[in-house]
């Protein structure tokens, strides 16, 4: 084990003892917010330290076996004991490396997922509808709740833009690598000559913030407009100005919400999306600065990056960041994207491990 890694583990061991003392003190529960933070930290560290204790026990066993090997009568037995102890140490070191990886504080959050049609006109909008179905079906498979925040439909039944709110367990951790450019190659329904067209959409996955206070927004910097909701019709459509459009003047960020009949709830939801977009822009700026010092294949989330191609004639989906091609496009467009999400998460973990090894 590298000295730097051992030093981190020794520090966590010391910190766990401090937390045990703090949590059992009479003062601990006087500030419940602070108490909850301490219990979360204790839970995170205890798992690591428990594995570190097992590692040190295996290390002691290996050293004891080395001493035992000096006795000729015990050498064969000692060799086997030492072999087992070293194998245990190797496995535990690998586990500890992963446990020490920096955690993304957003991993457990719900998300706003935004799909925008790019190049390709009507075909791009139809593909946006296909991506909407793919992510909706994937969310249903995970047991997540799906809410449509806003949707701008195209003439042929696709979407110029659609924003979803996905609520469930660890939503962001599963979908955070979906941000970027998605390209489709196929024969459009409107194509009479059978020619393959290329269209594109942009996907943005933004973690939902816990509190609006996470981003300080001056109300004077907001322009709030109300308008009549548009939709498929019905007795409740276009009767009141319940839809909300909020413009953040300093950044030019615009958010619309018309999913609810209540103007108050639409405004509340629009503010959540606005805060998430502003936070997302700041995170992307930070990641771009980090990328200048460390090349990351998976985790940049740059909207201008073409991350994936969906080739329908060949029945394949290719993720260009990890050079992975899967020939099951029909199943994947129906929400079966677990293999892709797992591969991207594994690549990201490998990058983090490599960075940890460099330190």
UniProtKB/Swiss-Prot annotation:
Pfam families, A to Z: PCRF, RF-1
Keyword vocabulary terms for this entry: Cytoplasm, Methylation, Protein biosynthesis
Coiled-coil residues: none
One GO location term (cellular component): cytoplasm
Main location: cytoplasm
UniProt function note: Peptide chain release factor 1 directs the termination of translation in response to the peptide chain termination codons UAG and UAA.
Family indicated by similarity: Belongs to the prokaryotic/mitochondrial release factor family.
NCBIfam families: prfA, PRK00591.1
Protein name: Peptide chain release factor 1
Organism encoding this protein: Polynucleobacter necessarius subsp. necessarius (strain STIR1)
